[in-house]
Amino acid sequence: MLRNESLEELTDGGKYTADSVVKVDPDGCRGCHLCCEVVEDTIILDPYDICALARGLGKSFQELMQREIALGVCDGIILPHLNLVEKENASGRHCVFLGQEGEMQGRCLIHSFRPGFCRLFPMGRLYEEEGFSYVLLKNECPYQDKKECSVRAWLGIEELEQYEAYVLEWHSFIARIREQLPQENEEDRQKISLFLLQSFYLTPYREGFYEDFGERLKKVKGVLFA
């Protein structure tokens, strides 16, 4: 999702790499789950996220659509996002994966395979011509006395360099699609979105995600940018 605020308004002003040490760890959150009580459908899911959810829950994309995820328009493109459910005893909504009972009450039910957006929070990415940097968002996480840790440890993603290359490739591809969409009529915009969903989300990935994704991306570019 695009945001219009300036970098100075949103961040602490620093630009970080995966090996930078930042004060970001809330020490297990200790009963806080405000970031899971979102009011808008802002947790957009990329292909890696969907692959992780599908494998972690043992469900297909179509099965996830029954409860866990939904489709929405994000800056002109139809993309999946985490579903939100109404709170049982209060007003507002929370993430469908926020535990509501027992020892998992107030805890993430999919923490080991949570989406990239959730792993990154309260950090973000600043995309520039040569790649991207990590940034620390201000006033996003209310937890006090955060501990220092490396960005790499905070993300907790295996093969992080490969993941970062994928993230940059996906971001660049989606940005190019967004540039192209205004030139299309409404019917063609719908067709492009459905083509993207079918190509990158609906069809299950092979065991080697990055290789499979690369092959799909090459084919899609050949169709859309020929």
Where are the regions a protein language model picked out?
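Short loop/turn segments that flank or connect secondary-structure elements
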Residues: M1-A226
